């Protein structure tokens, strides 16, 4: 996914939020999935220049953000990395009714350090993950609660590789922490979203998980 498209859509979301709410006109508090850090930071700066309205963004895994909102953390807008944690927020009646919609989609990709010898990995049922990792760990958000990890577990399970890969995971609290392990070459491979990969100069995409191995990677948002 092109970084500019992410920024454009994030900007459109903020504009719609301003138009549909009566909260304080000098500040918008956004709780956003860590995968949107770069795009939302850029659009927030431009938005303030254009409107004199400050966008205060808090980034973490969607599970962490949803639970913070449940505990009373103030937010005007919640942007989740998957539908599951938006479902959670809605079920807990933390969101304004009828404000949920899918902001954009994403890809699930395999990354390696920029200077790694690995250039292309065909991800299928024949992929030899142990050989690819060569004694190292596969960095990914914790599949127990982090959306990117949940998608990764689903994809690897459908490829018949989960039992092999599970003990080899380096589990992190959010997608950006997983990518950071690959950037620092502490892990030879990682699973992130396409939007994260293009935001880093230190990693490269070496494979894309087939779309039919996991649920669509969708980024929903809603007003709190």
Describe each region flagged by the PLM.
Residues 1-9:
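Bacterial N-terminal signal peptides that target proteins for export
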Residues 9-14, 18:
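Hydrophobic helical h-region of N-terminal Sec-dependent signal peptides
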Residues 18-24:
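Sec/Tat signal peptide C-region and signal peptidase I cleavage site
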Residues 24-50, 54-73, 82-83, 87-106, ...:
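Exported/periplasmic ABC-transporter solute-binding proteins
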């Amino acid at each position: 996914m092109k970084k500019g498209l992410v920024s454009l859509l994030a900007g459109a979301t903020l504009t719609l939020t301003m138009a549909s709410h009566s909260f304080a006109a000098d500040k918008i508090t956004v709780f956003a999935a860590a995968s949107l850090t770069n795009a939302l930071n850029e659009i927030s700066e431009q938005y303030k220049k254009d409107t004199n309205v400050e966008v205060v963004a808090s980034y973490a895994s969607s599970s962490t953000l949803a639970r913070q909102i449940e505990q009373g953390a103030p937010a005007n807008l919640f942007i989740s990395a998957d539908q599951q944690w938006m479902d959670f927020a809605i079920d807990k009646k933390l969101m304004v009714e009828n404000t949920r919609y899918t902001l954009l989609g994403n890809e699930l990709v395999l990354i390696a350090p920029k200077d790694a010898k690995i250039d292309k990995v065909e991800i299928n049922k024949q992929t030899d993950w142990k050989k690819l990792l060569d004694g190292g760990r596969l960095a990914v958000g914790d599949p127990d609660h982090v959306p990117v990890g949940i998608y990764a577990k689903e994809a690897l399970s459908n490829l018949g590789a989960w039992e092999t890969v599970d003990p080899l995971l380096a589990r992190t609290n959010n997608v950006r922490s997983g990518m950071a392990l690959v950037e620092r070459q502490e892990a030879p491979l990682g699973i992130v979203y396409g939007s994260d990969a293009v935001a880093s100069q230190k990693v490269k995409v070496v494979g894309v998980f087939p779309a039919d191995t996991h649920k669509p990677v969708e980024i929903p948002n809603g007003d709190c």
